[in-house]
C-alpha cells in the first residue's frame, strides 16, 4: 500500500463514520415533523418485511404532522402495526388509506435525554475516528519499517493523518451542536 492510497483510504473511512453519525442522528426525534423519522419502520407486506417508503408515500403537511398515504388498502393495518412496533412514540390516526401521525411536543426532560443521546453518538463517532487514525499510523510505521518511506516522511504523513482526524472531529462537533440546537428549539 502506498502513501497516497493510504491517505485516500483513511479519508474514505472517516467520511463513512460521519455518514453513519448522520444516519443515527436522523432517527432522533426533534419537535418538528420529518419523514426521516420513519426510516426505521418496516412493514409486513406480501410475505416479507419492507421499508415503509416502499408501500406508502410520506409527506409533512405541517410542522407537527406526518401523513402516510398507503397505496394498497389491504396494507393499512400492517402499516399501522409497523409504526406502532417501531416504538417512535407516535399514535397513528387512520382515515381510509391515509394515516396521520401527529408529532407530540417534546418535554424538556425528553429533549435533554435526546441531546445526551446525540452527544453519545458523537463520542462513538470520535472513537471510530481515533481507531482509524491508529490504523493509519500503524500502516505508516510498517511502510517505514519496510523502507518504503523515510523517517522524515513518516513524521510528515503522521502529522497529516492527525490533521485529517482533527478536521473530521471538528465536523462531528459541529454536526452534534447543530442537532442539539434543533432538538432544544421549541
Curated annotation (Swiss-Prot):
Signal peptide: none annotated. Gene3D superfamilies: 3.30.1360.40, Ribosome-recycling factor. One of its GO terms (biological process) is cytoplasmic translational termination. It is found in: Cytoplasm. The keyword Nucleus does not apply. Its main location: cytoplasm. One of its GO terms (cellular component) is cytosol. One of its GO terms (molecular function) is ribosomal large subunit binding. InterPro entries: Ribosome_recyc_fac, Ribosome_recyc_fac_dom, RRF_sf. Pfam families: RRF. Keywords: Cytoplasm, Protein biosynthesis. The keyword RNA-binding does not apply. Responsible for the release of ribosomes from messenger RNA at the termination of protein biosynthesis. May increase the efficiency of translation by recycling ribosomes from one round of translation to another. Belongs to the RRF family. This is Ribosome-recycling factor. The lineage of its organism: Bacteria, Pseudomonadati, Pseudomonadota, Alphaproteobacteria, Rickettsiales.
Amino acid at each position: 500500500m502506498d502513501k497516497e492510497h493510504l491517505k485516500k483510504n483513511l479519508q474514505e473511512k472517516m467520511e463513512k463514520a460521519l455518514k453513519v453519525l448522520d444516519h443515527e442522528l436522523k432517527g432522533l426525534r426533534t419537535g418538528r415533523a420529518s419523514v426521516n423519522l420513519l426510516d426505521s419502520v418496516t412493514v409486513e407486506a406480501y410475505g416479507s418485511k419492507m421499508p415503509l417508503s416502499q408501500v406508502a408515500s410520506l409527506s409533512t403537511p405541517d410542522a407537527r404532522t406526518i401523513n402516510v398515504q398507503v397505496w394498497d388498502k389491504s396494507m393499512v393495518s400492517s402499516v399501522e402495526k409497523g409504526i406502532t412496533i417501531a416504538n417512535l412514540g407516535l399514535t397513528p390516526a387512520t382515515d381510509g388509506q391515509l394515516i396521520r401521525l401527529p408529532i407530540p411536543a417534546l418535554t424538556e426532560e425528553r429533549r435533554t435525554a435526546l441531546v445526551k443521546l446525540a452527544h453519545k453518538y458523537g463520542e462513538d463517532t470520535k472513537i471510530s475516528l481515533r481507531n482509524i487514525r491508529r490504523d493509519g499510523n500503524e500502516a505508516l510505521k510498517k511502510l517505514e519499517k519496510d523502507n518504503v518511506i523515510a523517517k522524515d516522511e513518516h513524521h510528515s504523513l503522521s502529522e497529516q493523518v492527525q490533521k485529517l482526524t482533527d478536521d473530521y472531529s471538528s465536523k462531528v462537533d459541529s454536526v452534534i451542536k447543530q442537532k442539539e440546537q434543533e432538538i432544544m428549539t421549541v
